[in-house]
Amino acid sequence: MSHHVPNLYGTPIRDPHEHKRNSASMGEVNQSVSSRNCERGSEKGTKQRKKASRACDQCRRKRIKCRFDKHTGVCQGCLEVGEKCQFIRVPLKRGPAKKRASVVSNEKFSSDNDPLQYRPRTHSYPMNSGNNYLPSLARNSSFPSISSLFVPSITAQSQQFVKVPYDDIKRRSSLATLGSDSSISTEFGGNYRLDENLNVRQEGKDIVAKGMITPVEEMGACSSNVRRQGSQSLPIQEQRASPYINPFISGKSRLSSLSYTSEATTSEGNTQGKTQCMLTPNSVRSIEKERLNSLTAGCPNKKLGTDGRSDKWDKNSTWKPVYRSSNPSHPSTEKNVSLNQEASAKPLMLGTYRQFDAISFYKVLGIYYNFFHINFPVIPINKSKFTDMLDPEKPNVIDEIRQINNEIIQCFKTALEVLVFCKIKQRRSSKSTKSWSHDNLCDFQKGLYYIQNFNKCIADCFQSLITIKPVLKQNSSVIPSRIKFIYFSTIIVLNFILILAGEESSLLLGPSVGVFNEFQAHKLFLPFENTSSMLLLNSNEESGDEILDYAVLFKRLYILLNILDTLQSFRLGQPKLINLNFGSAIETYFSDKTGHNQVVEKAPVALDNILRNLKLGEFITYFVLNRKSLQVNVPHHLLFTNQTDYGEFAVEKGEHDNIAGKFETLLKKKKILIRKLLNIEQKNDHILENCCNSDAEMKNIGELVCSMITLVSGILDSITNMNAENSVDLDSKPLPNAYFAQDSEEELMSPTQSITSNLASEENTRCTTKDLMGTVSIFMLPMVEECYNIISLIGPIPTTLISLYIRNGNMAKGINDRIMTLSTALNELVQITALFNTLEPFRKNAHDRAKRYYVSATSSTGCYESVMKSMYSGKCAASNASNVAPSEEENKKILKKFADIGWKLMDDSELGCCCCFFN
């Protein structure tokens, strides 16, 4: 016989044994219209409560006492501010976890029988649901619980106090404990199983694994739970607090940062008239999260259609927010759009309106042309022409070609999004008004996904391109050249991303060169009369009533790939994969002489900076191809002769006004200094016999070293003023409103174009540091590494020369001037040290390499063993001076020390600026 004891609110309490029988369902709770009790199934007896079992969300957030009134249904604190009492927050469990009897069936777990669902503890991001061709890159990953992905729709007036299903949501330190064979049942009829490659396979009918959800409702509940989630996401918050969480800091540390890989999942619910959505990432800090919720609270939902025939590239790369609603006017099963209708219609990325819940492709493209293109044109064509290429509505294109076109465009968009999103600068302070995360929550979530799954996104996108390659090659005669141009541009973008990130392996560079060679891109530079028969070319196509010379465009792509190969060879000291001598290719194929139609950039200021950076890459290519290490059997007398002919790279007027010109001059002077220091070792006895020769050599070396220190100081100062973090900074160079309005092509003009339209003369066409503020340069990392190595090697020379002059006691007028010059160089060394500390992303890498440099390159006696010196040890032995006076003995040691510095500089030039030396 069950006894009912009235509680504080006058409602009967069920027998505990009866409650145990009814609580077998995981989400089942007592539903009574007037019940506001907090039952505990484990208690044997029940006594009346004198106060509310817990504070409401509003009082708990304000940390005040909750005085709940059962008659009004509102506590005193909420009544004063005019808000409603809500008890949506799920409190943390106390005590050990209790065992559950069994897993409840999906039929009983529905929103009709159980309106109290769970508060999500995790977040989710989309990933590829197909096969992983490179599973090793996504090895470190885990998945959140599928049953905790959706925000419930709870009416606060119906129930003020709910029984929290503690046993269903267990506190775990890591989500990686889920086994690969564990099956997860969901409340919406879907069944998920994690396979060996950590992919989520969809088995339910109503599950649509297409994209990411932007929360638009229950914002108060989201913000009230931020403080509780802060303790669970502390490691991720510490990463978000630093602006250097992106994968462009270190190639090795990035592999360990792939903590999880998950898939955004949406499904059709049973709640009428409510839109359910996923939570924001736990890594968002509380104040930032509240701002994002307020930004997205008033936006209407937009139903985006999905294509059932979309291939794995849709799931791999670009995904759009998909909402689920139980409104009968929007059925859950939509008809699939045919390929012909999809190809004939203009794609979503090129729409004429801007959607709030999906990033505009024009915005991504605009960020590239404003922050990347001005320094290195990965897409070697101006924006208006390239946008026209992306339009699939072209004449004489069959349906199969449209399908290939759409797939290639999807791969290109994925590569461009990875480049842009991973280089967006995340703000420490919440006062920033133009930060990427404050503009759109969906954009921020997508960027966080790309950062956490950097290598996997790159590998999947490149694997998709390799899969398309046989079809592209087999149908090369009927596929338009513009589609091939987008295909090879995507390959260049992927290699650009890895080199920009400082990747120390040729993961994609070798296969990319193979793809270009397979399509015979190198034959475009040969004087063939009939070029239309080549695989890359069909015939010139009309684009916007103008003719594009695709032969020039493909030549540009091959030259860009050659420069990327050069940068890897320059940094790592490895042989080049492309050894063609293009001559003056930059002036021939990239300048405005090629015609206004296929010009790289219409703005004169941006075009001038592009040409300067590409000429720097051309010079570094010439610098790498003339390495002595590639000529091991060269006669010893040729080692010290001036073989390098820099006549083609003469210093132009105003060259030192930009970073590229300064770095090119630094490399030239470094080559001259190496030759002078190595000549000292050969003429040691002759120099010591004549004091005048000794003074002349010291003077030349001192002046050359001081000028190099000044150049390094200027380079680092320009980099610091331009973009010390080498990331996209929307505060320093904000995008115009034209990228959001998208009304006309004139409005899409870049800021540099609008600036140059007001210039009165050609003298102002030079690109200044102000024009480059906030832009990203691929040359920045090699520059900083090379400057660090040079300063580390030649830094002791000014101090040594000053001590030598003072010890000799010759304080003539010329000597005093030399000492003043050397003292100025010492002051600049102090400033250079401070500048290196400012360049935080590069400073860590530089210090690590310097440690390897000095530890692994020293012998057991602690002396430096030069690799190049050991190669030429029998060819360039130093002469021994006879009858050397005691006063000249110190000079001899100094000269020998300078010769060792020359060998070290030669090792740096020959073996790479970030290589590891071995004994």
Curated annotation (Swiss-Prot):
SUPFAM superfamilies: Zn2/Cys6 DNA-binding domain (SSF57701). Pfam families: Zn_clus (PF00172). Residues 23-36, 318-338 have a biased composition (Polar residues). GO terms for cellular component: nucleus. It is found in: Nucleus. Binds DNA in a sequence-specific manner. This is Transcriptional regulatory protein EDS1. The gene is EDS1.
